[in-house]
């Protein structure tokens, strides 16, 4: 029969795994948003404005969704927080550049 200490340790392990999964989700979605931004750049360059606008809208939605997840993330190390802030900035800068094309 597990002790209270065992249950606490298991709870902490599960919580840490969930937090890591959340960070992985944020990183993956930010990369997907960057892909949408690159697709939009290409589409604008080819004159496919509707396709470009759709790609930008998807990237913007992903950006705002991930900001919400990021704001709720707990126990971030300074390094991870800085890494994610840098990725958010890169995406925001890219989206701003792409939107000037449209």
Where are these regions (language model features)?
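Long, non-catalytic architectural segments outside compact domain cores
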Residues: 1-54, 61, 68, 72-102
């Amino acid at each position: 029969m597990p002790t209270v200490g065992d249950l606490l340790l298991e709870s902490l392990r599960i919580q840490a795994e969930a937090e890591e999964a959340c960070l992985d989700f944020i990183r993956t979605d930010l990369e997907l948003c960057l892909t949408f931004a690159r697709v939009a750049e290409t589409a604008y360059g080819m004159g496919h404005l509707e396709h470009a606008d759709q790609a930008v809208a998807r990237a913007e939605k992903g950006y705002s969704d991930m900001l919400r997840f990021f704001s709720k993330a707990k126990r971030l190390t300074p390094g991870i927080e800085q890494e994610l802030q840098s990725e958010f900035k890169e995406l925001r800068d890219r989206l701003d550049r792409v939107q000037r094309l449209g």
